[in-house]
Amino acid sequence: MKGLLSLSVLPVLAYASPMIVDSIHQNAAPILSSTNAKDIPDSYIVVFKKGVTSTSALAHQNWVQDIHTSVESKRMKKRNQFTFKNEAFDGLKHTFDFAGGFLGYSGHFDEEVIEQVRRHPDVEYIERDSEVHTLKAATENGAPWGLARISHRDKLNFGTFNKYIYASQGGEGVDAYVIDTGTNIDHVDFEGRASWGKTIPQGDDDVDGNGHGTHCSGTIAGKKYGVAKKANVYAVKVLRTSGSGTMSDVVKGVQWAAESHLKSVGEAKKGNRKGFKGSVANMSLGGGKSVTLDRVVDQAVAVGMHFAVAAGNDNADACNYSPAGSKNSITVGASTLADERAYFSNFGKCTDIFAPGLNIQSTWIGSKHAVNTISGTSMASPHICGLLAYFLSLQPASDSAFAVAEITPAEMKDNMISIASKDLLSDIPSDTPNLLAWNGGGSDDYKKIIGGARENDTTEFSSTLTEKLEKLAEEGLTAIYNELKDAVVA
């Protein structure tokens, strides 16, 4: 029976319109599913209520595994010895103990088990695990132009088409976590700055067998193809060679990246990572709406990670997809060389900014020198992730060994939006920000980049206001003149 919903989960669902809520009564945790996602049968993500401790969560996880074992044992005894179909349930898969208080777990459970779980007082909600996939749109021949576009205010021409103007130290001291299919870490364009971080899908190899993650990594930090040419790259593999995976694996990948970031922060504070300036992350992937994934991404941002996520390639409202609908990340739509919204790019109020995403050339798999040209918001998001790393690296080092600037992800997001080139793109719906990413035109002075852009905005506003006032004054004087004229004639 759909309808009744515990009050604790209402705030979470306030912006999750594509969600279906299945709740049998008020004393049972609701089961959430997305109308635009492909569910994985009998697979769930369980999220604990706020206030539940790590100790209580561990006890609960042991409890649910015991129930699972007991139920499976009974099922095995009842099975017909001639039944060859594999009906076994795997039980607990991942545990989530996220910095800042997000606790939960995922697993493959029998309905009898999950019904007991949803009645446990510590459980806030349960979400059906679902498929996640890369957002690649098409493969076409072409030349790189995206870097040039984000370093020029004006529309590209033959003189600026292939000229990327940038600060040479861009990305230095910044770690970029690419949560995707992996990265070809031996590619020459990474100059030894790429490392394998973590493989989340069970039984998968530490290699990018798809190419999508490698392409994103190259746009972020490659020597030739990257925005932030000195950044470090860490491959976090959450999708398999096919380019698809599970929502629970993606959630676990985000947790791993955030934990790795916090370790780096700790090491820097101890003086063991001099020059460390922070961490950025890119997620050029998506699926249906997932309250859990959006929540976890926002939690990673809360602990200091700067996140860029792809808006999606459905030519639809980005708010209906995850992680595009996360509140605190930067959601990126795709633009073309002609300064149009790419025909496939999602849009809407959840889209924060646009970046080049059509015919983008970058690193690939197959050899240390392989390249490929592909399109999608998957290619736009790494431009913004690279810009996040680029701008972080321009921050002045503090007096301590921990050189992370006093700029939060929220402030960085606001600044990037404030300096973006405005109203240049065509085919932008009215509810979508018409903003195209800009890197400051090669300046290495972050404060001047931000201050100059805001000063220009103020000047433009003042100029526009003056023009309007002058027009009103002119209209007012004309009206007075006409009144006097009419009076004289009368």
UniProtKB/Swiss-Prot annotation:
InterPro entries: PCSK9_ProteinaseK-like (IPR034193), Peptidase_S8/S53_dom (IPR000209), Peptidase_S8/S53_dom_sf (IPR036852), Peptidase_S8_His-AS (IPR022398), Peptidase_S8_Ser-AS (IPR023828), Peptidase_S8_subtilisin-like (IPR050131), Peptidase_S8_subtilisin-rel (IPR015500), S8pro/Inhibitor_I9 (IPR010259). The lineage of its organism: Eukaryota, Fungi, Dikarya, Ascomycota, Pezizomycotina. Keywords: Glycoprotein, Hydrolase, Protease, Secreted, Serine protease, Signal, Virulence, Zymogen. This is Subtilisin-like protease 8. It comes from Arthroderma benhamiae (strain ATCC MYA-4681 / CBS 112371). GO terms for biological process: proteolysis. CDD domains: Peptidases_S8_PCSK9_ProteinaseK_like (cd04077). GO terms for molecular function: serine-type endopeptidase activity. Pfam families: Inhibitor_I9 (PF05922), Peptidase_S8 (PF00082). The active site is at D180, H212, S378. Its EC number is 3.4.21.-.
